[in-house]
């Protein structure tokens, strides 16, 4: 099954009005293949700024997080309805930095994922192992556990993109080899086929999210189960366009 190549750009807690304008303007003027979907995730305070600047139908805007309640006394949180209200269509959930620094458990991520999907946004669901877990050779057990928590709450995966992000590679400059990533992605797809169906598994896009950049993105070009990238630091730089075009 042909899956549309997907590039996500997670700006994290970086950027200003000026720098985000520069990034969006660069995308507005870039050559983007028609068969590529691009989603950028600026900080929440700049979501409507990015939406207003964006001129490309291939480019959508995402939040980096959302709470699992519609409204209420949850100081500092953003609801899915608020995210939709400013024009964003996606949300990143389960990112390792949320799991690590903000103590988000598999259960919390699953609840957020179900609530976001039920509320009408699409989800980039992040999973991945730490260095310690990698050294213990339990990568597959970890990602399957993380997926299983969501599978218990979400049956329809039409609007879910999975991002495999080896935590040991994020922001370190280290990266899994294309071959290693392909092996993990294939195992993830087989797990989804077992738990859902072959058709669903073959339709779900699985991204690589560990220090992808303009130089190493092309090495993943012929990997059948690598359907794109969730890019961190490189999404703030001109090389983000190179990553978008890495399958051309």
UniProtKB/Swiss-Prot annotation:
Taxonomic superkingdom: Eukaryota
Active site per UniProt: 95, 165
Q: Which InterPro entries does the record cross-reference, listed alphabetically?
A: Aldolase_TIM (IPR013785), TIM_sf (IPR035990), TrioseP_Isoase_bac/euk (IPR022896), Triosephosphate_isomerase (IPR000652), Triosephosphate_isomerase_AS (IPR020861)
Which reactions are catalysed by this chain? D-glyceraldehyde 3-phosphate = dihydroxyacetone phosphate
Q: Which UniProt keywords apply?
A: Gluconeogenesis, Glycolysis, Isomerase
Q: Name one GO molecular function term.
A: triose-phosphate isomerase activity
| Residue positions binding substrate | 10, 12
Q: Does the keyword Isomerase apply?
A: yes
What biological-process terms (Gene Ontology) are attached? gluconeogenesis; glyceraldehyde-3-phosphate biosynthetic process; glycerol catabolic process; glycolytic process
Q: What class of enzyme is it?
A: isomerase
Task: Provide the E.C. number(s) assigned to this enzyme.
Answer: 5.3.1.1
Q: Looking at the UniProt record for this protein, which Gene Ontology cellular component terms does it annotate, in alphabetical order?
A: cytosol
Keyword Chloroplast among record annotations: no
Which pathway does it take part in? Carbohydrate biosynthesis; gluconeogenesis; Carbohydrate degradation; glycolysis; D-glyceraldehyde 3-phosphate from glycerone phosphate: step 1/1
**Family under the similarity heading:** Belongs to the triosephosphate isomerase family.
State whether it acts alone or in a complex, and with which partners, per the record: Homodimer.
| HAMAP family to which the protein is assigned, alphabetical | TIM_B (MF_00147_B)
Indicate what this protein is called per its UniProt record.
Answer: Triosephosphate isomerase
Organism of origin is Kluyveromyces lactis (strain ATCC 8585 / CBS 2359 / DSM 70799 / NBRC 1267 / NRRL Y-1140 / WM37) (Yeast)
Name the encoding gene, please: TPI1
């Amino acid at each position: 099954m042909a899956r549309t190549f997907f590039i996500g750009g997670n700006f994290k807690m970086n950027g200003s009005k000026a720098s985000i304008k520069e990034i969006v303007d660069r995308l507005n003027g870039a050559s983007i293949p028609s068969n590529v979907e691009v989603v950028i995730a600026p900080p929440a305070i700049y979501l409507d700024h990015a939406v207003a600047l964006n001129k490309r139908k291939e480019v959508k805007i995402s939040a980096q997080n959302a709470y699992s309640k519609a409204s209420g006394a949850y100081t500092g949180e953003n609801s899915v309805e608020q995210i939709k209200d400013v024009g964003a269509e996606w949300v990143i959930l389960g990112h390792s930095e949320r799991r690590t620094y903000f103590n988000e458990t598999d259960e919390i991520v699953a609840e957020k994922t179900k609530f976001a999907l039920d509320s009408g946004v699409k989800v980039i669901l992040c999973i991945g192992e730490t260095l310690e877990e990698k050294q213990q050779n339990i990568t597959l057990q970890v990602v399957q556990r993380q997926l299983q928590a969501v599978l218990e709450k979400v049956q329809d995966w039409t609007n879910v993109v999975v991002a495999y992000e080896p935590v040991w590679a994020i922001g370190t400059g280290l990266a899994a080899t294309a071959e290693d990533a392909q092996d993990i992605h294939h195992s993830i797809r087989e797990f989804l086929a077992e738990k859902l169906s072959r058709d669903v598994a073959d339709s779900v896009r699985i991204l690589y999210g560990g220090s992808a950049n303009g130089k190493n993105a092309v090495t993943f070009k012929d990997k059948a189960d690598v359907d794109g990238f969730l890019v961190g630091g490189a999404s703030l730089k001109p090389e983000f366009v190179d990553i978008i075009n890495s399958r051309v």
